[in-house]
């Protein structure tokens, strides 16, 4: 497509919504589309949209599930403000298609778009559809899901396509090729998701300290932007050397370089691990709405592509024992089984739907 159509990407809150949105936004731009991003000001999506050259259209709104009574009491006023702001964005941008990728920020924009008879494409990243997507699914023109059955009865005709991924995740060498040249200590990657994970930041250094120095893996540990100093203190207290970063820009290369990963089970993380083909121990976020991280991880673990450990069962001694027993042949087997579960057509499916609806 070479026409100058306009898309409004609606995704925010966490990397699990934002990075699939980024994959679709970049693919649309490469096809000649003008792309705007609906998000909250001073947010993760605002920062990432700016980094990648997308215009941010601001709407002030926040999630309500799991919040207190005071937040719920203010919901009508906050919704009215968000609807008014979204209406102004739509009048200014005049999008040909709206693309909603979940997160609370997508709801006011999508609803105002439907009232203006704008085509709506929805994608759900998690194994259990979020509230915004469930409410919108019956009115959307196209509905896609990263995991089978994510929408349940809310959208029985939703197409299972996997998660939109940036090209870097599908361009890595396969697991067999990567593992063939590896020798020496295992490479351990620890990721807590885009917001970090305090439990992993505290427990992993303690576990590594229980291993003899000669048996310790080489470690790359992503802390989350606000937890890097605390993470440095944990490793210093444990007497363990590691490469520590608040955020990993090239996640695809980091996944490909790892022999084993300890991580949360956000939708993007699970899909990216499958696309690259890597062995992972998933420790789902216990406070995730609808326990969707456990469901995300279960999809890959049930296929033999990793391990699942609830956070309340995670301990330094147990993790140390697991790490001490790992060998590359078994890790390669897990990586191959994870890789066999990859679904990498989602970006193209969503772009195709946008072009069809805007024609």
From Swiss-Prot:
Domain of life: Bacteria
Cysteine pairs bridged by disulfides in the record: none
Pathway as given in its UniProt record: Cell wall biogenesis; peptidoglycan biosynthesis
GO CC aspect terms: plasma membrane
The reaction(s) this protein catalyses: di-trans,octa-cis-undecaprenyl diphospho-N-acetyl-alpha-D-muramoyl-L-alanyl-D-glutamyl-meso-2,6-diaminopimeloyl-D-alanyl-D-alanine + UDP-N-acetyl-alpha-D-glucosamine = di-trans,octa-cis-undecaprenyl diphospho-[N-acetyl-alpha-D-glucosaminyl-(1->4)]-N-acetyl-alpha-D-muramoyl-L-alanyl-D-glutamyl-meso-2,6-diaminopimeloyl-D-alanyl-D-alanine + UDP + H(+)
Bilayer disposition of the protein: Peripheral membrane protein
GO aspect biological process, one term: lipid glycosylation
Entry keyword annotation includes NADP: no
Entry similarity comment: Belongs to the glycosyltransferase 28 family. MurG subfamily.
Function: Cell wall formation. Catalyzes the transfer of a GlcNAc subunit on undecaprenyl-pyrophosphoryl-MurNAc-pentapeptide (lipid intermediate I) to form undecaprenyl-pyrophosphoryl-MurNAc-(pentapeptide)GlcNAc (lipid intermediate II).
PANTHER family: GLYCOSYLTRANSFERASE, UDP-N-ACETYLGLUCOSAMINE--N-ACETYLMURAMYL-(PENTAPEPTIDE) PYROPHOSPHORYL-UNDECAPRENOL N-ACETYLGLUCOSAMINE TRANSFERASE 1
HAMAP family: MurG (MF_00033)
Protein name, entry field: UDP-N-acetylglucosamine--N-acetylmuramyl-(pentapeptide) pyrophosphoryl-undecaprenol N-acetylglucosamine transferase
Organism, as annotated: Verminephrobacter eiseniae (strain EF01-2)
Underlying gene: murG
């Amino acid at each position: 497509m070479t026409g100058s159509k306009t898309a409004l990407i609606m995704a925010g809150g966490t990397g699990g919504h934002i990075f699939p949105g980024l994959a679709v936004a970049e693919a649309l731009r490469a096809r000649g589309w003008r792309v705007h991003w609906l998000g909250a000001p001073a947010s993760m999506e605002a920062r990432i949209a700016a980094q990648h050259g997308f215009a941010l259209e601001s709407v002030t709104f926040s999630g309500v599930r799991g919040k207190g009574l005071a937040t719920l009491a203010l919901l009508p006023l906050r919704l009215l403000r968000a609807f008014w702001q979204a209406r102004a964005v739509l009048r200014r941008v005049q999008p040909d298609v709206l693309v909603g990728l979940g997160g609370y920020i997508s709801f006011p924009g999508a609803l105002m778009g439907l009232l203006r008879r704008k085509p709506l494409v929805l994608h759900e990243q998690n194994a259990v559809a979020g509230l915004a997507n469930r409410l919108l699914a019956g009115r959307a023109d196209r509905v896609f899901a990263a995991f089978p059955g994510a929408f349940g009865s809310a959208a029985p005709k939703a197409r299972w396509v996997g998660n939109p991924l940036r090209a870097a995740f599908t361009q890595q060498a396969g697991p067999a090729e990567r593992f063939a040249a590896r020798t020496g200590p295992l490479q351990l990657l620890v990721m807590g998701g885009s917001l970090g994970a305090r439990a992993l930041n505290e427990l992993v250094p303690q576990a590594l300290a229980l291993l003899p120095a000669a048996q310790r893996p080489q470690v790359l540990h992503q802390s989350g932007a606000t937890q890097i100093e605390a993470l440095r203190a944990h490793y210093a207290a444990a007497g363990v050397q590691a490469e520590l970063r608040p955020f990993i820009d090239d996640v695809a290369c980091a996944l490909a370089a790892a022999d084993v990963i300890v991580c949360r089970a956000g939708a993007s993380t699970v899909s990216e691990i499958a696309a690259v083909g890597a062995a992972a121990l998933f420790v789902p976020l216990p406070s995730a709405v609808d326990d969707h991280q456990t469901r995300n991880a279960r999809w890959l673990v049930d296929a033999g592509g990793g391990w699942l450990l609830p956070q309340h069962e995670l301990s330094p001694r147990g993790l140390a024992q697991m790490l001490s027993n790992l060998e590359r042949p078994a890790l390669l087997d897990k990586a191959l089984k994870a890789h066999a579960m990859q679904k990498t057509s989602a970006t193209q499916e969503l772009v195709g739907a946008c072009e069809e609806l805007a024609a």
